From Swiss-Prot:
InterPro entries: AGPR_AS, AGPR_type-1, NAD(P)-bd_dom_sf, NAGSA_dehydrogenase, Semialdehyde_DH_NAD-bd
Enzymatic reactions: N-acetyl-L-glutamate 5-semialdehyde + phosphate + NADP(+) = N-acetyl-L-glutamyl 5-phosphate + NADPH + H(+)
Gene designation: argC
Matching Pfam families: Semialdhyde_dh (PF01118), Semialdhyde_dhC_1 (PF22698)
Record-level GO BP terms: L-arginine biosynthetic process
Organism: Ehrlichia chaffeensis (strain ATCC CRL-10679 / Arkansas)
Broadest EC class assigned to this enzyme: oxidoreductase
Domain of life according to the entry: Bacteria
Biological function: Catalyzes the NADPH-dependent reduction of N-acetyl-5-glutamyl phosphate to yield N-acetyl-L-glutamate 5-semialdehyde.
Active-site annotation: C151
Gene3D superfamilies in alphabetical order: Dihydrodipicolinate Reductase, domain 2 (3.30.360.10), NAD(P)-binding Rossmann-like Domain (3.40.50.720)
UniProt name for this protein: N-acetyl-gamma-glutamyl-phosphate reductase
Residues of the signal peptide: none
Length: 346
């Protein structure tokens, strides 16, 4: 067996954290040294999640303050915004970090403050590479610090980044209607996430006010080399555990056809292990749930010179834990598909 990378998963008992652990357990180059959480110290992960047994992982959950960082190569942070940056400030000089919070995604400190509040270490934000793997592969490979994108931004940016970079779509008037499984709201106990509140109901929330908006707009501006892109964004919770579908409404640049857009996406992602253009599979989350895949479909709009792009991902995998492992693989110069070759759930 080759050298195994020792990792710590901080925030291991949340939905994203436990998905990350599940993936890392199948990674031949990884040894999970520590699992950290605030409320389950001393317990096994199997006491929180029955689908993981003591035979799978016998590491007791510990407090972050009790771990020995000299025995860790990479720390995965599955923590809320604000909490994650506090940890990064302590460990930045010691280990590689893959952060799944929002704390290091937004590069403008004032924009971050407007949407999330004050940042405890804004001077460290520039050290982090935005971890949209298919777009920033080379930067990720060279970096020690990765800020993994949010789930909504992942589903939107995978199709739009190359189209804006290639000047195929207009940068203004972008409309996104996105639907997410309830796991996207996290594991904390809140009334609006109880079974009777979410079952058999579709609920819109934070219309034009979702915290993922500035993250999406930042990357769209980078893609288009502009400073003023604003999009209409409506997030919706749907009564399923996992899965995400974004319907994206776009106006084409003059002289550009639907075929041009589809061929551009096919060419851009021709070597991708996880992003595929397939109209039939892009119309259902069943094609992606349980995987790190993203399926895209390009459809004609009824309004002249418009198109509709459908983008589906698993919000817990390509939208979170799966992309984190993909980034880890790229960072460590491993095959990006290691531990991510799942087939979809039925």
């Amino acid at each position: 067996m080759s050298y195994q990378v020792s990792v710590a998963v901080v925030g291991a008992t949340g939905y994203v954290g436990v998905e990350l652990v599940r993936l890392l357990l199948s990674h031949p180059m990884v040894k999970i040294k520590y699992l950290c959480a605030t409320q389950s110290s001393g317990k096994l992960l199997s006491s929180n999640y029955f689908h993981i047994s003591q035979d799978d992982i016998s590491v007791n959950i510990s407090s972050f303050d009790d771990i020995d960082l000299s025995k860790v190569d990479v720390v995965f942070l599955c923590l809320p915004h604000g909490t994650s940056s506090e940890v990064v400030r302590k460990i930045h000089d010691v280990v590689r970090i893959i952060d799944l919070s929002a704390d290091f995604r937004i590069k403008d400190a004032e924009v971050y403050k407007q949407w999330y509040g004050s940042h405890c270490c804004p001077d460290l934000v520039r050290d982090f590479v935005y971890g949209l793997t298919e777009i920033y592969w080379e930067d990720i490979q060279r970096s020690r610090f990765i800020a993994c994108p949010g789930c909504y931004p992942t589903s939107v940016l995978i199709p739009l980044f190359p189209l804006l970079r290639l000047c195929l779509i207009k940068s203004q008037g972008i409309i996104v209607d996105a639907k997410s499984g309830v796991s996207g709201a996290g594991r904390s106990v809140k009334q609006d996430k109880l079974f009777c509140e979410v079952y058999d109901v579709i609920k819109s929330y934070k219309i034009s006010d979702h915290r993922h908006i500035p993250e999406i707009e930042q990357e769209l501006c980078f893609a288009a080399c502009r400073e003023d892109i604003n999009l209409q964004f409506v997030p919706n919770l749907i009564p399923v555990k996992r899965g995400m579908m974004s319907s994206i409404y776009l106006e084409l640049e003059e002289g550009v056809s639907l075929t041009d857009v589809r061929e551009a996406l096919l060419l851009f992602y021709k070597d991708s292990s996880f992003v595929f253009i397939d109209e039939e599979k892009a119309m259902t989350t069943r094609s992606v749930v349980g995987t790190n895949y993203c399926y895209l479909g390009v459809f004609p709009g009824r309004v002249p010179n418009t198109i509709i792009i459908m983008s589906v991902i698993d919000n817990l995998l390509k939208g979170a834990a799966g992309q984190a492992v993909q980034n880890f693989n790229v960072m460590m110069s491993y095959d990006e598909k290691i531990a991510l070759s799942n087939i979809p759930y039925f």
